[in-house]
Amino acid sequence: MRAFSTLDRENETFVPSVRVYADGETEDNSFSLKYRSNWTPGRFNSTGAKTKQWHYPSPYSRGALSVTSIDQGAYKRSGSSWGRPYEEKAGFGFSLDARSCYSLFPVSQNLTYIEVPQNVANRASTEVLQKVTQGNFNLGVALAEARSTASQLATQTIALVKAYTAARRGNWRQALRYLALNEDRKFRSKHVAGRWLELQFGWLPLMSDIQGAYEMLTKVHLQEFLPMRAVRQVGTNIKLDGRLSYPAANFQTTCNISRRIVIWFYINDARLAWLSSLGILNPLGIVWEKVPFSFVVDWLLPVGNMLEGLTAPVGCSYMSGTVTDVITGESIISVDAPYGWTVERQGTAKAQISAMHRGVQSVWPTTGAYVKSPFSMVHTLDALALIRQRLSR
């Protein structure tokens, strides 16, 4: 908001007015003019309802208009008074009450409504919904941390699956690379299972990390009513030309109008209970010498199930939202010559506006939305694809 004064203020301007008679006499009628230069209608605010989990947003409006005389101009006329001819030069002597300047801008008289261009309104509504449907929204701390853990789980799973696949195919140099081990290592065993067992100091810590990330995800308990937020702001500059009836004047307005839409919603899908029924064995507790080489496939299956659950689309329920319109700008007013006068220099004034109005939106901008899971990152999907393709039997 532009920092206009919140108090009503008067301003003062000097209006020159000098009459010169043909006989050389000069008559100075210059004067000072006071006018209301600032207008701030009362703020409108209301308190939103509260629940234990949520404080609903409330409508709010405020605004300010100011007007400043830039130049009273120079106008002249010829005439006579009691038979004495004269030439007179004067400023216009106009004053604009700031309360009457709202017509220079696309706003209502009390500044609680701003006329937003339809293209801006449509774009803001469409793009905020795109953020929801594409999963591009504020996740909240708990979900953001869980997303980071899911990313770690996927990365480590990819490494393990690729190492397992390379070993199964006899490509031991590549398997060593995936396990971050020395590629020149010499193996004692000639059998695949034996060589894989020799590499347990590479894949066993990796499996332990996978287990840790997996268990961390299954232990996360999100609130049932966890608000998430999507925001989009769109603005444009507009120009307006027009006429005032009093004083007779042209005006040129330039202003910026923006619309900001905020949507609060929550994911209402049961999958965010984190598939707690799934289990995964601690790799440190397994006697690997006693299990078949292919056990790694069975061990990774719950990880695949979790990744599949995390990446599935989830439903959303609308909580509340706000639509905030803001206008800032100015208008230059150029005053015509009064009847019987000619213009040497037009009188000008400048009006400025700064206003905002926030309304509450109780429904989706369009019909309901589905979101892409916040865990649907590329490498998460890669890990899921690897488990499905390379470990299938």
From Swiss-Prot:
It is found in: Virion. Its main location: virion. One of its GO terms (cellular component) is virion component. Keywords: Host-virus interaction, RNA-binding, Viral attachment to host cell, Viral attachment to host cell pilus, Viral genome circularization, Viral penetration into host cytoplasm, Virion, Virus entry into host cell. During internalization, MP is proteolytically cleaved into two fragments allowing translation and replication to start. Residues 26-233 are annotated as: Viral RNA-binding. InterPro entries: A_protein. The maturation protein is required for the typical attachment of the phage to the side of the bacterial F-pili. Binds to sequences located toward each end of the genome, hence circularizing it. The RNA genome-maturation protein A complex is released from the capsid upon host receptor binding. Maturation protein A enters the cell along with the viral RNA. Belongs to the Leviviricetes maturation protein family. Interacts with the host pilus. This is Maturation protein A.
